Amino acid sequence: MFFSPTISYLTSRKYNLRILCLSIGDADGKGNVRKEELYRACAVLKVPVQQVKFLDHPDLQDGFGKVWNHSLLTRIIGEEVTNHDIDFIITFDNYGVSGHCNHCDVYHGVRRLLSDGSQKDIEAWELVSTNIVRKYSGPLDIWFSYLYATLSGGEMRCLLNEHTQKSFLAMAQHSSQWVWFRKLFVAFSSYTYVNTLRKIN
């Protein structure tokens, strides 16, 4: 829902993209349904199903208030990096766009991976969370994002969604969540149209 401009940008340029989903989203007991929905959404965005991985770890269950262990996240992410020779990670920032604690936990897991020195040749970038005005300004936020990225001295990148219709179609694959307010979110959210990535130092 948040990363579709980045995914579209990378797949259209033939990057070897892998998606690691650290939970099946079983907070409402619909984990298996949501797993299949994400597979279909990734197919719309041209990510091969064999390059999408889900975890259903007992200590990484989805839900507000269910804080994830950062050391465990670091170990799991580190194993994926090693197993697939990954040299570039894109994740949430420390607010996680929506403020969801699990989004924030993933950021801290990646941050810890970078700081422990075990992965020296890896680069990581975070999806920048914006204030509520920018978040719901739709395509107008492209201009703000471009300005911030230009003034960042190379620490930020602005990725435009060149295929917004695919983002709508991909989100529509999540039929269990495709309710009226999420349709409005996809239409008005700046994250449908542009992603601003910031390098994690």
Regions found by a protein language model. Give the residues of each.
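Active-site beta-strand->loop->alpha-helix modules in alpha/beta enzyme cores, enriched
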Residues: 1-121, 173, 180, 185
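The feature marks non-catalytic terminal segments
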Residues: 116-201
